[in-house]
Amino acid sequence: MGKEAPAIGIDLGTTYSCVGVWQNDRVEIIANDQGNRTTPSYVAFTDTERLIGDAAKNQVAMNPRHTVFDAKRLIGRKFSDPIVQADIKLWPFQVRAGAHDVPEIVVSYKNEEKVFKAEEISSMVLIKMKETAQASLGADREVKKAVVTVPAYFNDSQRQATKDAGMIAGLEVLRIINEPTAAAISYGLDKKDSGLGERNVLIFDLGGGTFDVSLLTIEEGIFEVKATAGDTHLGGEDFDERLVNHFANEFQRKYKKDLKTSPRALRRLRTACERAKRTLSSAAQTTIELDSLFEGVDFATSITRARFEELCMDLFRKCMDPVEKCLHDAKMDKMTVHDVVLVGGSTRIPKVQQLLQDFFNGKELNKSINPDEAVAYGAAVQAAILTGEGGEKVQDLLLLDVTPLSLGLETAGGVMTVLIPRNTTIPTKKEQVFSTYSDNQPGVLIQVYEGERARTKDNNLLGKFELTGIPPAPRGVPQINVIFDIDANGILNVSAEDKTTGNKNKITITNDKGRLSKDEIERMVQEAEKYKADDEQLKKVEAKNSLENYAYNMRNTIREDKVASQLSASDKESMEKALTAAMDWLEANQMAEVEEFEHHLKELEGLCNPIITRLYQGGAGAGGMPGGGAGAGAAPSGGSGAGPKIEEVD
């Protein structure tokens, strides 16, 4: 590969991901090999291959136990986290506790048990997005750098784990940025020179798995986040879950059968519910029809929009709390908000729009940006800014983001002493002097927490370290200087220094237990390479088989009496010659590249197909296409060559 490709922007979503790049003075959102501009955040493992994206999601009903999704709801969380425990009950794939209470996902791949961390699954989705961009930008320019987005309300460990996922995917993560802030860029970029002056903009971002609200002021290309609030576990999937439960109960009532015992039935139902939910955003009623859903029972039923709203009403209302909190934190009245901007697929739900509009006293909501693509768009702009690519159109944009949670340390009696309050603009650095609690105390334990509660036990411990070697002195005399430093990714470094001795100790909070070590990341990078090689190998085998099948089927066809008698001698000779040549080449080049196999197949088809077609039109009538359709069937399927061989249509 020659020169480096431009840096890309990736929206790594709970349910779908999206990638964009700044090109030709604007952002281009890149479609994947299936022609879709968003890609399911799904990874599937089978006896023969690994599938990512559409191919993985399309076969999920056939393979629910080994198709992994929702990695974003696991990343940076502990196994014992109540949220993780609740999710495990809903997932068809197996999650168990690993070392340091880190969740591990267990699947079977090529008939062997494999164990993955959430970072690894996310890295596979990132690799897919990277490859999507790569295919569009051309093989001569290698994609290396990316800006990756996270929910604004993600905490320190979730951010760090996302950054690690990027490293495992072989990407240099230039910056982790917040999703609503990225969406705000997408919204504000075209208004930069509109002369409107300062605008207060509320971004309401409700996606597949997470929810964020951010309030920004945008003026002349300066995007300043005033406050942010949200829920890292609220989104479209939770609405789907309500529908699944509703219909599972209905099924139980009607047929006295519990379909929840079958992962496959449950998955088919969930897919139908997701579809029904989308339909209900534009229709007042919809039906669900699933043949032979469970124990031979055909399930046909319907649901109205009103019933769906009733099932999810508490969740919809829950979306309004962060809006209030955000305004309160920004010390802003709702009447002073100029624009309320919708982002994320779930903002298409009419009831959510209505509640939000009512909250803002009937104000028109702004739907000017694409809710599925705005985040990747903003990330691509930020990537261009950070690499100096974007030209004057974007280079003078300035993003001022904030840290979502208060950060501090534990002082005597388990009290949370805050050094950096929530919604502080980042990057930032804060110092404070502490002292010992008892006479002649030789060391102090610095425990770092994030959260809003007064006592540390109610907050989240990010990490701890000791500062030792303090000379004997009465309590309160030693001076220990503690420095909290948050970088532009929202990731925290803490250091402490004993002023008398100059003893220092520091931690990047992320060295906390459960964080991947350098060695682990290195190992995962190598494994990612290995899986990629596996995928490549499979494509090779498929391409080789296609050529081989075609050649042998075609030779058998032209040797059949029916066909042979119709062929002119010259046609037969040229075909025999070409087929023998192809078989000889195959024999000698078992390890050729995919492109070579495909090239030979094309050449062969170019010669043989017209002759055979002429023959059939002339009425040789030899039962269908040769060899059961070698002509069509032998070509690699669907561009990617790795699509599922069969899929269920609900």
From Swiss-Prot:
Keywords carried by this UniProt record: ATP-binding, Nucleotide-binding, Stress response
GO MF annotation, one: ATP binding
Keyword flag ATP-binding: yes
UniProt keyword Coiled coil, yes or no: no
One Gene Ontology cellular component: axonemal central pair projection
InterPro entries tied to this protein: ATPase_NBD, Heat_shock_70_CS, HSP70_C_sf, HSP70_peptide-bd_sf, Hsp_70_fam
Region named Disordered: 623-650
Inducing or repressing factors: By light as well as by elevated temperature.
Alphabetical list of NCBIfam families matching this protein: PRK00290.1
Record protein name field: Heat shock 70 kDa protein
Gene: HSP70
